[in-house]
C-alpha cells in the first residue's frame, strides 16, 4: 500500500516544479511535462519514491538511528521543527552553522554554553547578577537557542539527514557527504539529484507540500521505533484515492491555472 496517494500529493501542490528556465537537466527523468513555462513533476514516480524513502527511514529507525531534519527556508521552518519533535528527533530550521557535523566537538561547546545559561536562569544566578549582565546573557541564550536549540539534546552525529531543498542547504549536504551520512531529501526540478542518496522528487517551496512529506518521514521514524503501523486511517485514505487522478488529469487541471506555481 502506498504511503501517500497521487491525489494527496496533487492537493498539496507537490507536482509543481520550477520555471523551465530554472531547471537542472539531471531532474529530467522525474519530470512528466511542461505547462505554461512550469515543469510538472511525475507524481507516479514520486509516489513510489516516497514509499522507498519511508521504508529506508523506518528501517534506520528500527536500528536505533538518530535523524536530523534540515530546512531553513521560511516555508519549511515550522514543519521541520514540529515534525522532528513529534518523532523524537532533532532539527536545524534556521541558518546552518558551518561545522555543525564536521566540527561537532566545537558545536558541543556552544551547546554546553546554552545549557549553562539556561541553568543560570533557573537556579537563581540571574537574581544576583547585575541587570546589564543578565540582559546580555539572555540575548546570548536567544541566539544560541535559535541556531542550536533543535540539536541541543542530540546525543551524537546523526545517522540520517532529511533535507528540504538540498540546493539551499548545500553546506549541510557537503558535510554529510564528508562523513558518509545518507541524505533523504525533497528534490525540486532545479536541484542536482546526484548529491542525494534517497530522492523524493517534489515541489520544495509550497508549505503544504513540505508539511505533507516531512510528516510522512516523521511517521516512518515513529513506526520504526514502535514496530507497528503508524496510521490505519492513512492506509484507508490511500486506498480510497487509488482511482484518483492520472498524470494526464493533473496536466489538464494545471492548464491555465498555475496559481500554486513559482
Swiss-Prot record:
PANTHER family registered for this protein in UniProt: 30S RIBOSOMAL PROTEIN S2 PROKARYOTIC AND ORGANELLAR (PTHR12534), SMALL RIBOSOMAL SUBUNIT PROTEIN US2M (PTHR12534:SF0)
Classification via InterPro entries: Ribosomal_uS2 (IPR001865), Ribosomal_uS2_bac/mit/plastid (IPR005706), Ribosomal_uS2_CS (IPR018130), Ribosomal_uS2_flav_dom_sf (IPR023591)
Alphabetized Gene3D superfamilies for the sequence: Glucose-6-phosphate isomerase like protein, domain 1, Helix hairpin bin
GO biological-process terms attached to the record: translation
UniProt source species: Lacticaseibacillus paracasei (strain ATCC 334 / BCRC 17002 / CCUG 31169 / CIP 107868 / KCTC 3260 / NRRL B-441) (Lactobacillus paracasei)
Keywords linked to the UniProt accession: Ribonucleoprotein, Ribosomal protein
UniProt-listed Pfam families: Ribosomal_S2
Stretches the record annotates as Disordered: 224-246
Gene that encodes it: rpsB
Listed name of the protein: Small ribosomal subunit protein uS2
CDD domains on file: RPS2
Family in the record: Belongs to the universal ribosomal protein uS2 family.
GO molecular function: structural constituent of ribosome
NCBIfam families registered for this protein in UniProt: rpsB_bact
GO cellular component, one term: cytosolic small ribosomal subunit
Matching SUPFAM superfamilies: Ribosomal protein S2
Amino acid at each position: 500500500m502506498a504511503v501517500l496517494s497521487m491525489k494527496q500529493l496533487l492537493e498539496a501542490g507537490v507536482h509543481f516544479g520550477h520555471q523551465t528556465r530554472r531547471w537542472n537537466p539531471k531532474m529530467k527523468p522525474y519530470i512528466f511535462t511542461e505547462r505554461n513555462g512550469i515543469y510538472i513533476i511525475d507524481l507516479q514516480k514520486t509516489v513510489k519514491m516516497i514509499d522507498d524513502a519511508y521504508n529506508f527511514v523506518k528501517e534506520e529507525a528500527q536500528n536505533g538511528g538518530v535523524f536530523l531534519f534540515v530546512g531553513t527556508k521560511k516555508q519549511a521552518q515550522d514543519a521541520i521543527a514540529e515534525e522532528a519533535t513529534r518523532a523524537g528527533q532533532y532539527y536545524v530550521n534556521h541558518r546552518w552553522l558551518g561545522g555543525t557535523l564536521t566540527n561537532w566537538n566545537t558545536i558541543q561547546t556552544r551547546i554546553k554554553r546554552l545549557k549553562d545559561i539556561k541553568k543560570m536562569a533557573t537556579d537563581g544566578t540571574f537574581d544576583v547578577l547585575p541587570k546589564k549582565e543578565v540582559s546580555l546573557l539572555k540575548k546570548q541564550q536567544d541566539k544560541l537557542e535559535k541556531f542550536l536549540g533543535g540539536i541541543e539534546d542530540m546525543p551524537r552525529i546523526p545517522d540520517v539527514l532529511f533535507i528540504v531543498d538540498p540546493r539551499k542547504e548545500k553546506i549541510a549536504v557537503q558535510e554529510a557527504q564528508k562523513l558518509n551520512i545518507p541524505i533523504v531529501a525533497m528534490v525540486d526540478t532545479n536541484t542536482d539529484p546526484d548529491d542525494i542518496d534517497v530522492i523524493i522528487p517534489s515541489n520544495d517551496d509550497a508549505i503544504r507540500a513540505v508539511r505533507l512529506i516531512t510528516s510522512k518521514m516523521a511517521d516512518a521514524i515513529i513506526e520504526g521505533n514502535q514496530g507497528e503501523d503508524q496510521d490505519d486511517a492513512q492506509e484507508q485514505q490511500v486506498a480510497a484515492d487509488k482511482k484518483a487522478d492520472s498524470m494526464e488529469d493533473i496536466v489538464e487541471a494545471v492548464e491555465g491555472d498555475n496559481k500554486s506555481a513559482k
